[in-house]
Structures are given as C-alpha cells and as structure tokens.
A protein has these predicted regions:
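Histidine-acidic metal/acid-base catalytic patches
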Residues: 1-10, 19-35, 66, 111, ...
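Active-site acidic/histidine proton-transfer and metal-coordination neighborhood
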Residues: 2, 23-24, 66-68, 83-183, ...
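N-terminal small/glycine-rich loop or linker at the start of catalytic domains
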Residues: 2-12, 74-86, 119-123, 224
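Active-site-proximal loop/turn and secondary-structure-junction residues that shape catalytic pockets
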Residues: 15-17, 41-43, 79-81, 119-123, ...
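Conserved beta-strand positions in the central sheet of alpha/beta enzyme cores
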Residues: 38, 74, 116, 154, ...
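Glycine-rich, proline-tolerant flexible connector loops at the mouths of alpha/beta enzymes
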Residues: 40-65, 119-126
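A short acidic, helix-capping loop that chelates divalent metal ions and anchors anionic groups
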Residues: 44-49, 81-87, 121-128, 192-194, ...
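Short glycine-enriched, charge-decorated loop/helix-capping segments at active-site entrances
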Residues: 48-52, 89-93, 226-232
Length: 290
C-alpha cells in the first residue's frame, strides 16, 4: 500500500479484468497507481462462493497481498440484495445471517478491515413495516457480531430511497449505538437523490470510514437517475466542491474509485484515466494528496 498518499486511493475489483487471478489483479492495480483493491462479494453464485474458499485459497490471496504490497482492506458485500435481512421468507433471512458470518470470517482471514453493507431492507420484494423492522434487527445483530470479531461494518448510501442519505443512516445508528456500525457513503448516490451534500457529509464526518467515488445522473421528476457506468464529469457530482468540503472537514480516510470495466477492451487504460481525472479535481480543490 502506498502510504505516501495522505488519503489512499483504491480501485474496485469490478474495474479490473474479470478473468485475472488475484495476484494479477493486485499487480495491475499497483501498476495503475492505486494503493488498494476493494473486493466484491455480490449476489452472483460465482462471487458468493468466495465465502466458502478453502484455507489454501485464502492463503493464496494473503501471499498475493504480501508479494505485491497491495492490500484488500475493504469488502463490498452486496450479496444481501439477493438474501436480505428484511425478507418475508425465514429461510432467506437465515441465509442473510450465514452470509454475514462467513463474510466476517473471510475478512479476518484476509486482513479486510471494513465490510460495506448494502442498505436494502428488501430489494426484490415489497417493502412494509415488517421488512424494515427485520432489517433493523439484522443490523443490530451485525453490530454485535462485528464488535466481537473486531471487523468494522459500514452501510452504503444506496441507489434506492430507503437508505439514500447519511441522515437516514444516522436515524438507524442512533438505535443501534455501536462504534462497529458506521457509514460508507457513495458520493454519486448521495448526490443523485438531491441531498444537501455539504450538510450530509458534515453531519456524518465522524462516522465516515471510507468514501466511494463515482458519477451519477440525478433523480428528477422526469428521470429515474442512473447509478452506474456514468463517465466521470458527465454526471451530477461536483467533484471540485466535494474535495474542497472534505479538505475543510479534514477527512483522512480512503477513496475508492468505483467502476465496472472488468469486461472493457482496455480496463487498465480506463482506470488510469479515471485516477488522473480524480487527482486533477483534487488539485483544483487545493488538495495536496502527496
């Protein structure tokens, strides 16, 4: 990990060539100038299977981390979109807990410090008072398991109305009251919903463990918004003002550039260009990240 940056800059695993090994992924990230990689455990069978990796497979990744010097400090655990804590189905809720326990064990084995949680009570089902109550119960349970395991869990600000602001996360956190239950905002999602970004980040700064960087198209009366695959600079996020604000707030956490270029013709070129673009906006904001 490049500790020369005051705020390390990482790249999302799904921005890297999909068929590459973990040693290759970390080496590519290093060659592209990134400090770390965020692992994805999404709702696909392929990536959920990572939770059942053998010890030999886990040690291979640890060896790759040691060889390259590029860490995997965070995990994006979006598998709960398929198996949500708020589900009406008891078996689905039980699977949600099993996934969480396995994710925490994987994090411990690989040295992952923070698991980003999906802020969905349900995704493919109808929401009601019971789904919300069960989700809150699940988050309380997670906070207890996280505390005992010494693995930070942090909720993402999402692409649906249920958890689309830091204010909404704080209302939940006030009920849970755990230092192991924090927030991991996505500035693209936060902006797309028309939030007062300055107010949201200011009120949440003491609880922000990391930040996702991506651009989005805003949700309006005539547009449902777009929450992924929006080229930097074409969406609604004012990155210069964002970095000015975070500089004033003395944010010292990591930045994760979130992209989905794993099947692109030249993903290496795209992620390097994205990093250069972000760092240029940081410089325009007066941010010296050397």
């Amino acid at each position: 990990m490049n500790t020369s940056r005051k705020n390390p800059i990482g790249i999302y695993e799904k921005a890297l060539p999909k068929q590459s090994s973990w040693l290759e992924k970390l080496a590519i990230a290093k060659a592209a100038g990134f400090d770390f990689v965020e692992m994805s455990v999404d709702e696909t069978d392929e990536r959920l299977a990572r939770l059942d990796w053998t010890m030999e497979q886990r040690l291979e990744i640890v060896a790759a981390i040691q060889k390259t010097g590029v860490r995997i400090p965070t995990m994006c655990l979006s598998g709960h979109r398929r198996f949500p804590f708020g589900s009406h189905d008891e078996k689905t809720r039980q699977m949600a807990r099993e996934l969480m326990l396995k994710a925490i064990k994987l994090a411990q084995d690989l040295g992952i410090r923070t698991i980003q949680l999906a802020g969905y009570d349900v995704y493919y089902e109808e929401q009601d008072a019971q789904t919300i109550a069960r989700f809150e119960e699940g988050m309380k349970w997670i906070s207890e398991i996280a505390a005992a395991s010494q693995v930070m869990c942090a909720v993402e600000i999402m692409d649906t109305p249920f958890m689309n602001s830091i204010t909404k996360w704080q209302a939940l956190a006030d009920k849970i009251r755990s230092p192991w239950f924090q927030v991991y905002p996505d500035v693209g999602n936060l902006t797309a919903w028309g939030n007062d970004v300055e107010n949201e980040l200011t009120k949440g700064i003491e609880n922000i463990v990391a930040i996702h960087l991506k651009d989005t198209y805003a949700v309006t009366e005539t547009c449902k918004g777009q929450f992924r695959d929006v080229p930097f600079g074409e969406g609604c996020v004012d990155f210069v003002e964002l970095f000015k604000l975070l500089k004033r707030l003395n944010y010292r956490g990591t930045f994760l550039i979130e992209m989905w270029t794993e099947k692109a013709d030249e993903p290496l070129v795209e992620i390097i260009n994205a990093r250069h673009w972000i760092e240029d906006k940081m410089r325009q904001a007066g941010w010296n990240n050397a």
